Amino acid sequence: MSRNLYPNFIQFIQDSMQELTDRGQEVELAGVLYHIGENDMSWGPFRRGAAERMQTLVNASRESLDLPELKCFVSQQPPTDDKQVNEIDVTSMIAEVAAADPHLIHVKTFDLPPQEKKLVLDTAGVVALGEELAKSWLKES
């Protein structure tokens, strides 16, 4: 995975689970949440590869955590409406990958509150995103 974020992501999960276990808690990782955001929705090369990167992250996470059926909830914000990238149907590509994986839930968060900036979610947008992920989690649990 790029920029060394992936090892830190996995280590954080493992450390958190171990910390809870050390405190006497029974721990089960029931799923992970991942957001496909601004860069993957707006820049052509990222938009073209978003679905493949998502699948790579999901597969690698399951392998690293030794949980082949780990549920992954992947939220997607609306694709940027720009003539330079509109021919790249990123939503369909992501939906196709999700449809082939019974443990991957594609959460289309296309009704977020209006944002001041074109791509960046503000506080209200992040809260709404969290609410949509929570609804999806509850529906699937």
Give names to the regions the model predicted.
Residues 1-141:
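Cell-envelope and extracellular/periplasmic
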